[in-house]
């Protein structure tokens, strides 16, 4: 992580004067005090327990500075109104500083598989990093950004949603160059009025994208009302711009052709949905 204490303070609009602290380079940012090592920034988030209760432990483990919503005695700290908001602002700043190309993936199903396939394809030509595990929410995404290797060129971010507006926040933070919506299903329907509202939330992935950026979306009538006007939208599915033209399924593998691919692709997995995921990752 190529950041220093003073730089972090500026990025998060610190409420205190940090110029008296050494402008030490930081190794990484952690919100779990048990994972803190020498040279780290501690991010005391509030969850089941208040991370502020573990600030002392974080410094014992090697932290050189902490974000905090209150004054900290005896240790360097960066005072902010809200630690989570500051964490997100720091990640947004870091993406802008590094200039890494961001690829974002969401969907009710298939987003993790598609993320992994896309990252694999990009890694053949670029230094690529991707969301680890299920770190796809308002905490996990900034954590992913701040943990990418210093030489990263392409960053593939998975974006999840439990409530309407979740993906809007993530997109505005990450400003994707390319985004994919794999499928609009009924996952998390308990938190949404209906499938149409799920589609609305998923398509908010375009909210932070620049004019002319590429958005891949399913050829599903449910998404039509929410497609952006300023981005290049390419649909996939039967009868759409991108489609599978031939599919051979075997016991433990498959081969498929798509209308834009010059040759067939072989996959060591089964299921047409995996062929679709691979197709859109390959575009």
Task: Give the residues covered by each predicted segment.
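Structural signal for conserved beta-strand scaffold positions within catalytic alpha/beta enzyme cores
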Residues: 44, 68, 79-80, 104, ...
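N-terminal leader/targeting and accessory segments in enzymes
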Residues: 1-89, 270
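Phosphate-binding loop of NTP-binding sites
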Residues: 7-12, 87-214, 219, 223-232, ...
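A generic structural signal for residues located within well-ordered alpha-helices
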Residues: 50, 165, 201, 219, ...
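Adenine nucleotide phosphate-binding catalytic loops in nucleotide-utilizing enzymes
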Residues: 195-196, 232-283
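Residue-level recognition of short, solvent-exposed, well-ordered loop/turn junctions
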Residues: 37-38, 210, 279
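Short, polar loop motifs at secondary-structure junctions
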Residues: 63-73, 218-223, 238-239
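Thr-Gly-centered strand-to-loop micro-motif
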Residues: 31-32, 43-45, 130-132, 157-158, ...
